[in-house]
């Protein structure tokens, strides 16, 4: 999550599997640190170079074949460059309130407490549970 002056940078994803508003991000490449991954993905999707990203929580979920995935949630408020949308989708600056009124990507609303509540650091999602810790 990238923040500036009370606004949050969100991406309206074009992905047919997971369309809707979410935060920029992506996958970790082989032999890449999580830190380097978030810096690279943000650059690829927004054209911004973030500085001092802070890990704020994690999400774990399972796909339809019961493969486990772990997502690392970061926040950053220091960056350089100009915002530029990518093939991933259109970028928009929104307030927290505006974000909550938009069409979000599937289950993304369940991730948001990890970003906004410092007492919550984990989101577990599987066939039987959708819990925050």
Spans of features found by a protein language model:
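Residues in well-ordered beta-strands of folded domains
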Residues: 1, 24, 56, 75, ...
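Gly/Ser/Thr-rich beta-alpha loop segments that engage phosphate groups in nucleotides
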Residues: 22, 27-28
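Unchanged
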Residues: 28-51, 62-110
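Nudix hydrolase/Nudix homology domain
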Residues: 18-21, 89-133
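Structural signal for conserved beta-strand scaffold positions within catalytic alpha/beta enzyme cores
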Residues: 10, 57, 93-95
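Short, solvent-exposed loop/turn elements at beta->coil junctions and helix N-caps
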Residues: 56-62
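N-terminal strand-loop-strand
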Residues: 1-22, 50, 54
